């Protein structure tokens, strides 16, 4: 009877130990994934920075990815060039305003 009690007592310990190794492996995979996401985040173009050469490389904002917005600039010499920057489109600003207002009301 004593041997059965010892085995029953050790069984949950062994199960928790084996599952914790699986969790450690999962955490290591998540850490590698987060490091890869951080690397991509460093490569993206921040808000208000020029994106003329890479129009799809803008970073993510709070809720939406910034969009590359372009304008035509006329220099003093009279030549036209296109200049682009990463920014938040007006409809995204409105959505962020509504969500922020909703968070203040509903907590």
Swiss-Prot record:
GO cellular component: extracellular region
InterPro entries the UniProt entry points to: Spider_toxin_CSTX_knottin, Spider_toxin_CSTX_Knottin_CS
UniProt xrefs under PROSITE patterns: SPIDER_CSTX
Propeptide part(s) removed at maturation, as residue ranges: 21-41
Pfam families recorded: Toxin_35 (PF10530)
Signal peptide: 1-20
Superkingdom per UniProt: Eukaryota
UniProt-annotated location(s): Secreted
Tissue expression profile of the protein: Expressed by the venom gland.
GO molecular function: toxin activity
Disulfide bond sites: 44-59, 51-68, 58-86, 70-84
Main location: secreted
Keyword list, A-Z: Disulfide bond, Knottin, Secreted, Signal, Toxin
Domain comment as written in the entry: The presence of a 'disulfide through disulfide knot' structurally defines this protein as a knottin.
UniProt similarity note: Belongs to the neurotoxin 19 (CSTX) family. 04 (U1-Lctx) subfamily.
Protein name: U1-lycotoxin-Ls1b
Protein's organism: Lycosa singoriensis (Wolf spider)
